[in-house]
Amino acid sequence: MKKHLLAVAIAALAASSAMAQANDTLAKVKSSGSITLGVRESSGALAYTLGDGKYVGFHTEMAENIVKDIQKQVGAANVAVKYQPVTSQNRIPLVVNGTVDLECGSTTNDLNRQKDVDFANTTYMEQVRIAVNAKSGINDVKDLNGKTVATTTGTTSV
């Protein structure tokens, strides 16, 4: 019973912390009149740059629609949108330190990241694959033992 109460208390504390962060962000947007979107420059159809500070893609457009809702929530006639390019390596730290208010890229929602940031509902799922030379003899992930593998820092692809 005590463990159950402790679990409920921890869950309530986590929920109140997330709500406080959301309220802090809304207050920041209301007082500054702007919001900063963390955008990927080359994340396939989800988020990419057209150059000259213009960003498009499924998640970018979704975030811009969220900004319209935020604008209504804070009672602002207009909320200026600033775009901050982010990478796999810096996207989570920039949300945590407040440089970015909302990141709109191809970021995996996992338990480790949930310790630092809150996620919206999942909107896209994919499966990571590997590519090797057909003559390499590598047919499965276990065949990579002892081999050099390249990946991007800050991703969940490995």
Can you say where each PLM-predicted feature lies in the sequence?
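Gram-negative bacterial Sec-dependent N-terminal signal peptides
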Residues: 1-20
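Cleaved targeting-peptide boundary
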Residues: 21-27
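Acidic, polar ligand-binding/catalytic clefts
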Residues: 76-143
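Extracytoplasmic small-molecule ligand-binding "clamshell" domains
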Residues: 22, 32-103
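Bilobed "Venus flytrap"/periplasmic-binding protein-like clamshell domains
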Residues: 36-45, 55-71, 108, 126-158
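Generic secondary-structure boundary/loop-capping signal
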Residues: 23, 43-45, 52, 114-116, ...
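Short, flexible coil/linker segments at domain boundaries that flank nucleotide/cofactor-interacting
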Residues: 29-30, 144
